[in-house]
Swiss-Prot record:
Assembly description: Part of the 30S ribosomal subunit. Interacts with proteins S7 and S18. Binds to IF-3.
Gene3D superfamilies named in the record: Ribosomal protein S11
Pfam families with a match to the protein in the record: Ribosomal_S11
Biological process (GO), any one: translation
Listed GO CC annotations: ribonucleoprotein complex; ribosome
UniProt family annotation: Belongs to the universal ribosomal protein uS11 family.
Function: Located on the platform of the 30S subunit, it bridges several disparate RNA helices of the 16S rRNA. Forms part of the Shine-Dalgarno cleft in the 70S ribosome.
SUPFAM superfamilies in alphabetical order: Translational machinery components
Record keywords: Ribonucleoprotein, Ribosomal protein, RNA-binding, rRNA-binding
Protein name stated in the entry: Small ribosomal subunit protein uS11
Highest taxon, organism lineage: Bacteria
Gene: rpsK
Native source species: Prochlorococcus marinus (strain AS9601)
Length: 130
């Protein structure tokens, strides 16, 4: 019988990336934090749902803070020190996620709001009546 070789999962090589860009997409239902290098290749990411929150709790500021801390921890392992922050969306976790990145030890050089605003494009969905 042939000996079975234990196959380990593909290990990402530890890259030394000193500068990067943090994309925070904050909606009313969830917050997604992606950390990329300056050319746009994703180094680490996290979201409120991936951090263990379900349902309505994903939209809370605390869930955004937890997601940002998890993504920042992995980026610091890759050697990241300075970041630019691009925030998109109207959600509750915007400021909390930025604060969590700062507390994690990343130096923020720029904060930019890149929320898409229509110049009167598509018709809005009809108003909810509860």
């Amino acid at each position: 019988m042939a000996a079975t070789v234990k196959k380990t999962g593909s290990k990402k090589s530890k890259r030394n990336v000193p500068n990067g860009v943090v994309h925070i997409q904050s909606t009313f239902n969830n917050t997604i934090v992606s950390i990329t290098d300056t050319s746009g290749h994703v180094i680490s990411w996290s979201s409120a749902g991936a951090s263990g929150f379900k349902g309505a709790r994903k939209g809370t500021p605390f869930a955004a803070q937890t997601a940002a801390e998890a993504a920042a921890r992995r980026a610091l392992d890759q050697g990241m020190r300075q970041i630019e922050v691009l925030v998109r969306g109207p959600g509750a976790g915007r400021e909390t996620a930025i604060r969590a990145l700062q507390v994690a030890g990343l130096e923020i050089t720029l904060i930019r709001d890149v929320t898409p605003l229509p110049h009167n494009g598509c018709r809005r969905p009809k108003r909810r009546r509860v």
